[in-house]
A protein has these predicted regions:
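Glycine-rich, positively charged N-terminal anion/phosphate-binding segment
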Residues: 3-78
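Hydrophobic "anchor" residues on beta-strands that sit immediately upstream
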Residues: 20, 82, 125
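A structural signal for short coil/turn segments at secondary-structure junctions
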Residues: 78-79, 121
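Alpha-helix-loop-beta-strand connector modules within alpha/beta enzyme cores
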Residues: 42-57, 102-128
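Active-site glycine- and acidic-residue-rich loops that bind
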Residues: 62-68, 125-132
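Non-cysteine beta-strand/loop elements that form the S-adenosyl-L-methionine
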Residues: 23, 81-91
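Active-site-proximal loop/turn and secondary-structure-junction residues that shape catalytic pockets
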Residues: 27, 62, 89-91, 132
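Surface-exposed, active-site-proximal loop segments in enzymatic domains
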Residues: 91-104
Length: 132
């Protein structure tokens, strides 16, 4: 969850017995574009975690298979325990751009995204968050 599951929140969750935690969801486009230093919180800083948080998943969202592939490659280099693709966020500024739950309306595009992420994840498991 954006602006919720940051490092302090994840640490508290682990201390209270959470089996697994996830990063805030990371915008693949923003990560690929590498915004200026003052905007880094929107991208690569969200990939930071401590070993004490493990197991931990990095959650990515985006509509383009190309940006998702690049973002997944970057995420995999951080060595999380898994990569999660967000196909469940219904917030309009995400879904109306074809990301999050917006991918559920385009199964062929969703498949491309998932295949590209799996292709660069290596041995890391890849999961997909959806909504029914």
């Amino acid at each position: 969850m954006e602006d919720v599951s940051d490092l302090p929140f994840r640490t508290i969750c682990k201390e209270l017995g959470a089996d697994i935690v996830y990063t805030e969801f990371v915008n693949a486009e923003g990560l690929v574009r590498q915004p200026p230093v003052e905007h880094r919180r929107r991208g690569s800083d969200k990939l930071l975690f401590r070993d004490a948080e493990r197991p931990l998943g990095i959650q990515l969202y985006g509509a383009s298979e190309f940006s998702m592939e690049t973002a997944a490659h970057t995420a995999a280099q951080r060595r999380p325990d898994l990569i999660d693709i967000n196909c469940g966020c219904w917030v309009s500024n995400v879904a109306l751009r074809g990301a999050g739950a917006g991918l559920l309306k385009e199964p062929a595009q969703m498949r491309k995204v998932v295949e590209r992420v799996i292709g660069v994840a290596g041995e890391l498991p890849v999961t997909v968050k959806t909504r029914l």
